């Protein structure tokens, strides 16, 4: 394990304290008998079959690749061209998933959470969601320390260690902080969780998506990402806000990137 720098310790300490405050508020709401977040009254929309097939195919392919890969293999370090290609692919896939959902054949578009009329509240809930995930994620991450090596960390973080130029950093920010949250929240929360919730109880749908989301990120990262996925799933289930879960995910990825830079 690398030495933790003073700026990183300050950032983690500040976020940890804020996270404990959020959990204190959550505990207070639970003791009062109220919901942590009031549930949405929006009807559950139907997921367009094209979007559902694309997501199920992608997830199946990812899980098959992980299952066939030797557990001892380290994470492949991409180069800048790989990151640029990843950004292009992510943007194209995002549009391919989004367009069927908002097409004229889908009258229930608002139920997917794309309504921004109350964007300030949605964004603030995303910030609170991020703060709420800090302590559980750190606790889960600490259990994986014996299995962590320099080659097991995310490929983009390894690239940053080899090439810390502003150009590389800009592309990594675009890939990890902007495009990855947009695409993954559309895939896992908006499409997969909504689709599952129409055929299974809400709690089981949330749990299943959280397991899949964590699994596709492979070990050891899957362990700390599981509580993050549970929180993201709960946020989306209660608010049905795409902006809320994207803000939470963006802040999480941005924090990981900032810690790597520090």
Task: Please state what every model-predicted region is.
Residues 109, 189, 193, 229-233:
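Interfacial helix-capping/hinge residues at the ends of transmembrane alpha-helices
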Residues 1-111, 116, 121, 254-262:
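N-terminal, membrane-interfacial amphipathic/helix-forming hydrophobic leader that caps
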Residues 203-262:
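Functionally important transmembrane alpha-helices
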Residues 55-66, 133-138, 210-218, 251-258:
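Aromatic-anchored segments of alpha-helical transmembrane domains
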Residues 65-89, 99-180, 198:
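Juxtamembrane helix-loop-helix connectors linking adjacent transmembrane helices
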Residues 118-125, 183-207, 237-241:
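Membrane-interface helix/loop boundary segments of multi-pass membrane proteins
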Residues 182-187, 191-192, 219, 251-255:
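Active-site His/Glu-centered metal-binding helix of metallohydrolases
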Residues 88-93, 174, 223-227, 231:
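Membrane-embedded alpha-helical segments of multi-pass membrane proteins
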